[in-house]
Each structure stands twice: as C-alpha cells, then as structure tokens.
C-alpha cells in the first residue's frame, strides 16, 4: 500500500462516515487513530521465525500473547470510550503466553551477524536487552564465511558490504550477485512458498518448469513473476557465465551440498555436517550429489522437501576456494585396522579419497590407540601375572600405579603409545608383547619393591624356581611334597602366607597349607 493511502486510513473522517481499518501489529504501538471506537482482535500474530528447513527467516502465524491482546484493546477509546471484541473464548486467556518472544531469540541471525560486521562491533560488546544465543550467532557467522561475506577472523569483506545493502537474505543476495539475472526465477521460488502441492516431488526443476509452462494457479504465477522482476533488478549484471540450476542453488546453500551415503536408502550427509533423507522413490533418490533448499527441519535427520541435482565438477568449480585435501589416520571398527586416508573435503562431504601412503608413525600409533580403547586390553598369562602382582601390593597399601584394566586404558597414551610403532591391526596388537610396556610404568625402585614383596617365582630348598599364581586373590604355588623338605619358615608373599598345594609323587593334590613346617 502506498504511503499516502496508509495516511488516509488513519486520518479522522470529517464527514461522519464510518470506516474499517485493517491493521498489522503496528496497531499495538502508541499510534493513536482518533475516531477508532471498536477493535476486533483475531488473537493471532505474525512473527519472524527461523525456518530450519529453508535456513532463512519466515513469517508464521501464531497465537498472540496476553500482552499483545491488552495493547490491541487499548487502541479503542484512546480519546473516548470504546469496545474491544476478542475472537476467542474467555477461558482461553489463561492458555495464551504472557509475552511474545523477542525476535532475536527466534529469527535467523545471519542478517544481524552481517550488520554487526559492517559496524565492526563485536556482539559481546553490545548491551542487548536479549543477547543472541552464541551457538546461533556462530552458525550465522559460519554461513557468512561460506558466502564470502566474512573473512576467517570475522571481518566484513567488500562482497559482504554489498550483500548488506540488498533487501533480501544474504543467501539469495549472494546467488544473485554471483549468477546474475539468470538466477532470479529460482531466487523467487526460494523466497516464497512452494508453488507445487505437497507430494509433487522434491526436484526444484519441476517448479521452474511449472512457472514457465503456466501450469500454476494464476495468483501464484503472478506473485512469482512479480518477485522475479524485483529480483532481476537486484541481480548483478556483471556475470555472463551460464550456470545450471543446481549450481545456482548451491551458491545460496553452500552448507547444504548433499552427498549420498552408502546403502540403498536415499540418505545424504550435507556439507554443513547435518544429515537429510529423500522420500523413497523420489526422482532424485539416485543422485550422488544434490543441493538441498528445504527440509522439515528435523535436527536428527531432516526429510528433504526441495532439492536439485548437481555435478561433482560443478562443485569443484564453484567451491575451489573452500575445498581442501585433508589427511587422517583413524581406527576402522569394521576393518579392525588403522586406515590412513587423504580426502578431498568440502565441509563434511568427501569428493575424493586416496590412501595416505606416507602417514607418520606417530599418527598411526595415535589411531591405533583409539583401536585399543575400543577393543580393550587382552593380556597374556605372563602379562596378567605381572599386572596382578602390582595390583595385589597396591591394594595392600603400597604406593604403586593403578594397573586395573580401566586405569590402564585411561592412561594408555602415556605407557602404551611408545610401544605401538608398526602396529596397525587388531592381529598385530594381539601379538604385541605388553609385558615390557607394563613394566615401563614402574620406576626402578618400584620394580625392585614388587620383585621383593611379590616375586614372580619362589625357590624351593632343592633349588627349583616355582612360578607364583596371583590370579586367585591369595598367592599360591603347587609342588611335590618332597620339594618342601628342609623348609623351616613358611614363605610370605605380598605380606601374607603363600598358599602351598602339596602334590603326591603322581602329581595329585594332597593338601593345601599356609603353615609349613
């Protein structure tokens, strides 16, 4: 509506005529319309809400708050008695929220982040009545970096200053500046409601064809044509490169480049790190790469409502400045081995992958350590006996390191890591001699004390070394009766009598004892 028509609506009538004024939420302000005597309140309000599906702010209709209802009623009778009619049951008053949420708490913060960058004002230095959520602001800044509006240290670029002057979301502004007028049709579709009925399929090219073929309702087509004309005037006319529909949408949604996951289901990982899925049987369900412009907003795995296919070469051309090769060593749970890869990455998606042939031993060992934590520690009998000896003395009060399996896994980076050189698989780990690694945990003095108080063997009067079994709580040995002849003092191990099981000449247990002679 033109400004003069708006002025005429609120000017007093001089000839006594009655008039009807349709007003937005501006009527909740201190605006006085002198001859208004009656207010009819629908109980609804239009609010700016961040639409997680489109990644932009949308206007949605919600229940008004009690505070808004009071303000609206106050427009009647500003200078004379008046009446307010509320189009809801009186009993519903208690269900209305007390106040409307601050827009900064619910809207997309991309525009705010861009304005703050233009001002050069750090958000934390501004006295917001309702400060923006740090996570939401950070997400907005990351998007602006992808759009080339901010530098890595969050400073505004010349491109960002230009986007800030455009009367539309930075996503669409960036697309129109990079692609030019050719993007005005798809920008108009992205900036309005879906022109096709639900169930028509996700492919955005269907929307473009419907607009061009005249298969849309007259009002919808007129609205889109009007929006297309408006956006053509905002587009840069310096771009002459012809781009596919997928490439143009990718300019607006660099965080929504989707790569199909392995498997039969049409599930995708997006360059921004989130997951999304197409409906089974959708025309795009076999596409290896897509650009997603609208979802249902599910934070776990969103259902894709609008998307378009894009080629790998197009992705590499459009985002050459954001694509990088990354090297990684990771433990593969499926392969039970360390996998060293060089990956061509755009955010969270992998465009190409190769074997990292010259991965450093330190990186491989660190990845193997993650495998150890997943697999657990499997000790051989000698390793288990040593560990048990230390634990037995520690439980008796000796100042020794904790060698429980839980503690050993938690501290593996300090004692096991140096011994993992050359170990890459679960089979190699199983064959690794851990005894030396376990012994390295003790100082020389601690090692001597363990050997003295909890020896690995005892020597009989006949001179034979018998291994001590520490795995059953109380240290014990088994030997033939004759080998104890000449014993005058019962052996003490770990501060307690050694349990001796005497065997017959045939090797059968005769008697366990802790008191010889």
Task: Report each predicted region and the residues it spans.
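Conserved motor-coupling elements within RecA-like helicase/translocase cores
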Residues: 1-21
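Ser/Thr-glycine-rich phosphate-binding loops at phosphate-binding pockets of nucleotides
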Residues: 20-29, 42, 74, 157
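Conserved catalytic network of the ASCE P-loop NTPase/AAA+ motor domain
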Residues: 11-16, 31-33, 78-79
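Conserved segment of the helicase C-terminal RecA-like domain
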Residues: 16, 20, 38, 44-96, ...
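C-terminal structured domains
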Residues: 432, 436, 440-517
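N-terminal helicase ATP-binding lobe
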Residues: 7-9, 21, 26-31, 35-36, ...
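Second RecA-like catalytic domain
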Residues: 8, 40, 48, 88-432
């Amino acid at each position: 509506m033109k400004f003069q028509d708006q002025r005429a609506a609120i000017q007093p009538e001089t000839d006594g005529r009655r008039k009807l004024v349709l007003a937005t939420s501006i009527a909740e302000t201190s605006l006085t319309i002198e001859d208004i005597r009656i207010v009819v309140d629908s109980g609804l309000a239009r609010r700016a809400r961040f639409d997680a599906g489109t990644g932009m702010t949308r206007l949605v209709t919600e229940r008004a708050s009690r505070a808004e209802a009071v303000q609206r009623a106050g427009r009647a009778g500003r200078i004379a008695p008046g009446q307010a009619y509320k189009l809801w049951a009186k009993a519903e008053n208690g269900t209305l929220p007390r106040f409307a949420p601050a827009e900064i708490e619910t809207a997309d913060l991309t525009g705010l982040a861009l304005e703050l960058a233009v001002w050069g004002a750090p958000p934390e230095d501004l006295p917001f009545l309702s400060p923006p959520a740090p996570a939401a602001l950070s997400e907005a800044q990351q998007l602006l970096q992808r759009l080339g509006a901010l530098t890595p240290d969050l400073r505004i670029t010349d491109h960002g200053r230009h986007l800030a002057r455009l009367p539309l979301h930075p996503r669409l502004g960036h697309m129109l500046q990079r692609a030019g007028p050719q993007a005005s049709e798809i920008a108009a579709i992205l900036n309005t409601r879906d022109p096709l009925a639900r169930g028509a399929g996700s492919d955005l090219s269907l929307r473009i064809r419907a607009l061009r073929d005249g298969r849309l309702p007259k009002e919808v087509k007129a609205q889109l044509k009007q929006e297309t004309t408006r956006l053509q005037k905002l587009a840069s006319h310096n771009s002459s490169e012809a781009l596919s529909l997928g490439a143009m949408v990718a300019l607006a949604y660099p965080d929504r480049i989707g790569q199909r996951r392995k498997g039969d289901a049409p599930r995708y990982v997006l360059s921004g790190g989130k997951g999304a899925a197409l409906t089974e049987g959708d025309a795009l369900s076999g596409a290896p790469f897509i650009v997603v412009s609208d979802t249902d907003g599910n934070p776990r795995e969103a259902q894709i409502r609008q998307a378009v296919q894009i080629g790998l070469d197009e992705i590499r051309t459009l985002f050459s400045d954001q694509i990088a090769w990354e090297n990684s060593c990771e433990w593969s749970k499926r392969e039970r081995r360390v996998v060293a890869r060089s990956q061509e990455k755009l955010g969270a998606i992998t465009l190409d992958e190769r074997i990292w042939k010259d991965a450093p031993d330190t990186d491989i060992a660190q990845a193997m350590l993650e495998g150890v934590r997943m697999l657990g520690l499997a000790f051989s009998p000698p390793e288990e006996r040593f560990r048990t000896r230390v634990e037995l003395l520690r439980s008796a009060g000796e100042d020794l390191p904790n060698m429980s399996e839980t503690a050993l896994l938690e501290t593996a980076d300090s004692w096991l890591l140096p011994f993992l050189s050359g170990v890459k698989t679960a089979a190699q780990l199983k064959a690794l001699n851990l005894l030396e690694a376990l012994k390295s945990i003790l100082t020389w003095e601690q090692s001597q004390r363990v050997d003295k108080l909890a020896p690995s063997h005892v020597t009989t009067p006949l001179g034979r070394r018998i291994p001590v079994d520490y795995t059953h709580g109380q240290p014990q040995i088994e030997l033939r009766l004759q080998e104890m002849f000449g014993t005058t003092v019962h052996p003490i191990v770990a501060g307690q009598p050694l349990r001796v099981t005497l065997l017959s000449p045939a090797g059968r247990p005769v008697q366990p004892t802790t008191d010889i002679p």
